[in-house]
Amino acid sequence: MPQSFSVDLSKINLALDSVRSIQVARRFGQEILIVRKETGTEYLDLDGSALEKLSREEAKDIVSNVTSLTPLAVEEISDPEPGSEYRGRNLPLFKVVTQDGENEKIHVYVDAISGQVVAIRTDQWRLWDLMWGLHIMDWEERDDFNHWLLKVFSVLALFSSITGLLLFFKIDLN
């Protein structure tokens, strides 16, 4: 459950150009600002200064604090890969390989600047993602469901339904 806290916005020194939203969050007990602009996302402290990237150890500490998982290894991700588990997330990220009580390996993705856990990926999620890719016929990115083969089968299904209704009600087209 999110914790509540007070922030005096009059003390924050911000240049507000093309801002879409401002979110106040906590990073290691310190309030930070997540400023989403048209050009991207900025992470600032309450003075308006840019935040430094977290260390690998800090990413492990975050995962230990917000989950019941045991961190094993940390990998920094700064280049996007098509079809990855973290697709659609802001980079850089830390991929923290963890283990649960049943020795299942679980990947926890932590934003390298805000410290927020942005994704948790288990074997069950990977199976779901595979089935989703097969369902929408997008095996690489798993984001585009406008595959031409899917459209052809949709038109055939619509045609079959209409002809089935015509036959059911015995409509004579002559």
Regions inferred by a protein language model and the residue ranges of each:
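Conserved histidines in hydrophobic membrane contexts and catalytic metal-binding motifs
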Residues: 1-174
